[in-house]
UniProtKB/Swiss-Prot annotation:
The keyword Nucleotide-binding does not apply. Keywords: Lipid transport, Signal, Transport. One of its GO terms (molecular function) is sterol binding. The lineage of its organism: Eukaryota, Amoebozoa, Evosea, Eumycetozoa, Dictyostelia. Monomer. The keyword Cell wall biogenesis/degradation does not apply. This is Putative phosphatidylglycerol/phosphatidylinositol transfer protein 1. Catalyzes the intermembrane transfer of phosphatidylglycerol and phosphatidylinositol.
Length: 151
């Protein structure tokens, strides 16, 4: 069978992608904050490292907050296999396990427990989480990629 030059290029590109791009086997995150954001993330951990549908995902975060937060908004978007499935906006100080005011200085919490729904499809999820303060200035931004499996 004879392949055109373009087909060979595409096949080679596809093979390179398969070799170079590793699948997500645990939770990976990226600080997407702007340099002027008021919260500087020092540590962000997820347990278990391999999220499982029907179980809790425990999130621990620590960092430095350079101004007091008296109120704010939280924005969350979740994409599954490149399809947007959730977009939420909520009050930072009500219903998120956060009590305002949040004082300026070192900040640490291990109290964020997020249950992964038992019927969550197995696959790759992308989460974008952005917080804004009482002055509508961005506090922080976090991008998370995870592969949720079934138990």
């Amino acid at each position: 069978m004879k392949h055109s030059k373009n087909q060979i290029v595409y096949i080679t590109f596809f093979i390179i992608i398969l070799i170079v791009v590793k699948p997500i086997e645990s939770v990976e995150w990226n600080d997407c904050s702007d340099p002027n954001d008021s919260f500087k993330i020092e540590k962000l951990e997820f347990s278990p490292e391999q999220p499982i549908a029907g179980q809790d995902l425990i999130i621990s975060i620590s960092g430095y907050l350079n101004k007091e937060i008296t109120n704010g908004e939280a924005y969350l978007s979740i994409t599954f296999d490149r399809i947007p499935i959730i977009k939420l906006k909520g009050n930072l100080c009500n219903g998120m396990g956060v009590t305002c005011p949040i004082q300026q200085g070192n900040y640490s919490t291990t109290t964020i427990n997020q249950e992964i729904p038992e019927n969550a499809p197995q696959g790759y999820y992308y989460v974008n989480f952005v917080l804004y303060d009482q002055d509508d200035l961005q506090i922080t931004c976090i991008d998370v990629q995870m592969n949720i499996t079934q138990s």
